[in-house]
Amino acid sequence: MQENYGASNIKVLKGLEAVRKRPGMYIGDTNIGGLHHMIYEVVDNSIDEAMAGHCDTIDVEITTEGSCIVSDNGRGIPVDMHPTENMPTLTVVLTVLHAGGKFDKDTYKVSGGLHGVGVSVVNALSKKLVATVERNGEIYRQEFSEGKVISEFGVIGKSKKTGTTIEFWPDDQIFEVTEFDYEILAKRFRELAYLNPKITINFKDNRVGKHESFHFEGGISQFVTDLNKKEALTKAIFFSVDEEDVNVEVALLYNDTYSENLLSFVNNIKTPDGGTHEAGFRMGLTRVISNYIEANASAREKDNKITGDDVREGLIAIVSVKVPEPQFEGQTKGKLGSTYVRPIVSKASFEYLTKYFEENPIEAKAIMNKALMAARGREAAKKARELTRKKESLSVGTLPGKLADCQSKDPSESEIYLVEGDSAGGSAKQGRERSFQAILPLRGKILNVEKARLDKILKSEQIQNMITAFGCGIGEDFDLSKLRYHKIIIMTDADVDGSHIQTLLLTFFFRFMNELVANGHIYLAQPPLYLYKKAKKQIYLKDEKALSEYLIETGIEGLNYEGIGMNDLKDYLKIVAAYRAILKDLEKRFNVISVIRYMIENSNLVKGNNEELFSVIKQFLETQGHNILNHYINENEIRAFVQTQNGLEELVINEELFTHPLYEEASYIFDKIKDRSLEFDKDILEVLEDVETNAKKGATIQRYKGLGEMNPEQLWETTMDPSVRRLLKITIEDAQSANDTFNLFMGDEVEPRRDYIQAHAKDVKHLDV
């Protein structure tokens, strides 16, 4: 091909006069963007040579003098006399606007840098440019300034290589900035290397001593994979189609984010404003996914109207087309205008992806579900925006009806209690200090937002009320400066249900109002679960553990256990109380708890085979007055039907029991009991009961089933009075770790949660003893 690339291939269209007068028309601007565009134009010429199969290495060098050198190992710009211009072709290419091989279809099937246009514009806007060509065994050289020849064209040496080297100095009379930016250039060269996997681009910046080499054999498939920083829903999908002299290459994948990252290129030129190639891809993709939803989604899911934005949520894609004569909107090629490209790309995308979906149903379903989720999220976001666009007036009319607002309008001194239940809300409203304390009752458990999509979340009345009351919006409309209360206090019953509601609310805040947590606005109230009364003594106790510890401390007074100090006994019985609590939990899950306790306290028995273990268990049951009616033994388990005071129970002893987190925790706690080496003449649980019974003599213990059982005065003095209350501030030290924790414990996946509990049960060391 080399001998066919000569002077006759360079077509001349018109002169160069206007470039210096209106540089913006040719390079976009005279700022940092236009400056780098100069380098791109020269590099694009080398890329054209590579696309035509004549070049595989491009070297770009920024010098300490402020110039840029671009070299390639292509065929070299023709140097023979031009047939119509009566001057060397190299001179024509560099001094005549619209003179280039691009305009001769036989030279380049496709071309990115408008060959000749780009180089001549660069020449016109440079205070100096030196062109060196290796061709025909010779080295040719010519110098220019401001687009004009300043040295004779001539041979300066011999060479067996071929290629072109352009060195230019941007004109500081034209450009506002003449300092090249390494990172901007490296990003562009990296893109070019992805788009042209056979090319190596070596980039060196002598000003800072940096050097990088870009070469990606995986091409644009590797590009989308490298762009993805999240969990991928699909592997990279790639296709390449040639039709009507147009080459279409597309690579895409989906991840679990909510944004789209679509990059498009025409003849290696990035088209930041898109164009007909992007439109064609989007059209084809939307059709494929819409068709797949129509054929495979449930009837209820089909009701969701899918838009193009929905199918591109979580999409990372590269669309690269090679077009013989592209029409760009604007000289800087920001947008492709060639209308015939759209149907070609649309057809190619539709046909390939339709086939791909048929052959890869798992990934197709993942993409379908992602689009359906996006559609629901879009509707929800619309609803959320409408909610937050309500009047910002603080008059009661714009706030939730159940909200009892405070009198203060100063957020820094205002606090809002999110209270579990209407009845508790009533007590809180009466007991509060209304000058700075607002009350918002929440009915029942709010939604687990980790398992629900945004549309469902925002249908929740409780969540709507919170968003409106806080005043700071949600999602994209969130504005922390509009928060109406700087303390948001979650106040729930002091039981398991209350803890669950706390967790649900914290999950919501972490996922959708994270800045409230990050800025220290979320707190947990600490209401008591028990009230202990004896004579004139009245003690509020936070939970079961606090009650048990208080009963132990009170009950050992007046009791005498010979040889045992009071503090030792107190610590010992606290461990026994923890052991009893675990045994109660085990009893809820496994039958014949007496046998399970016996094995925990005699762990050496478990080390034998099942026949030996069964023999020991049988003897133990007989001493307890229990009969074994039937049994079955193999190497994996023991099964026996035992007549106990509870009736007929099936006893199952196998690996599932021994590895259960509660069994392992009970064994760990009992080892701590044994380590204390205290001896009594009765069972340790009976000793604990004796102490508790002593503490309960003459006392009444009230358990608050809910906050609503407290009268307003009690609620104020235990939970709401700033001078005595205890609040826990919620903080997040490690956002990624917190994200993983919420996902693990509140998410849809059961297996990871189970695996975590089983894996960590043996590490339980958190007992406060």
Curated annotation (Swiss-Prot):
Disulfide bond sites: none
Subunit architecture: Heterotetramer, composed of two GyrA and two GyrB chains. In the heterotetramer, GyrA contains the active site tyrosine that forms a transient covalent intermediate with DNA, while GyrB binds cofactors and catalyzes ATP hydrolysis.
UniProt domain Toprim: residue ranges: 414-528
Substrates-to-products reaction catalysed: ATP-dependent breakage, passage and rejoining of double-stranded DNA
Binding residues for Mg(2+) 1: 420, 493
Compartments, record wording: Cytoplasm
Positions bound to Mg(2+) 2: 493, 495
InterPro entries in the cross-refs: DNA_gyrase_B_C (IPR002288), GyrB (IPR011557), HATPase_C_sf (IPR036890), Ribosomal_Su5_D2-typ_SF (IPR020568), Ribsml_uS5_D2-typ_fold_subgr (IPR014721), Topo_IIA (IPR001241), Topo_IIA-like_dom_sf (IPR013760), Topo_IIA_B (IPR000565)
Keywords: ATP-binding, Cytoplasm, DNA-binding, Isomerase, Magnesium, Metal-binding, Nucleotide-binding, Topoisomerase
General remark: Few gyrases are as efficient as E.coli at forming negative supercoils. Not all organisms have 2 type II topoisomerases; in organisms with a single type II topoisomerase this enzyme also has to decatenate newly replicated chromosomes.
Cofactor stoichiometry and binding remark: Binds two Mg(2+) per subunit. The magnesium ions form salt bridges with both the protein and the DNA. Can also accept other divalent metal cations, such as Mn(2+) or Ca(2+).
Database matches in PANTHER family: DNA GYRASE SUBUNIT B, MITOCHONDRIAL, DNA GYRASE/TOPOISOMERASE SUBUNIT B
CDD domains recorded: HATPase_GyrB-like, TopoII_Trans_DNA_gyrase, TOPRIM_TopoIIA_GyrB
Family: Belongs to the type II topoisomerase GyrB family.
Keyword Chloroplast attached: no
Name of the protein in question: DNA gyrase subunit B
EC number(s) stated in the UniProt entry for this protein: 5.6.2.2
Described function: A type II topoisomerase that negatively supercoils closed circular double-stranded (ds) DNA in an ATP-dependent manner to modulate DNA topology and maintain chromosomes in an underwound state. Negative supercoiling favors strand separation, and DNA replication, transcription, recombination and repair, all of which involve strand separation. Also able to catalyze the interconversion of other topological isomers of dsDNA rings, including catenanes and knotted rings. Type II topoisomerases break and join 2 DNA strands simultaneously in an ATP-dependent manner.
Site description Interaction with DNA, residues in chain: 445, 448
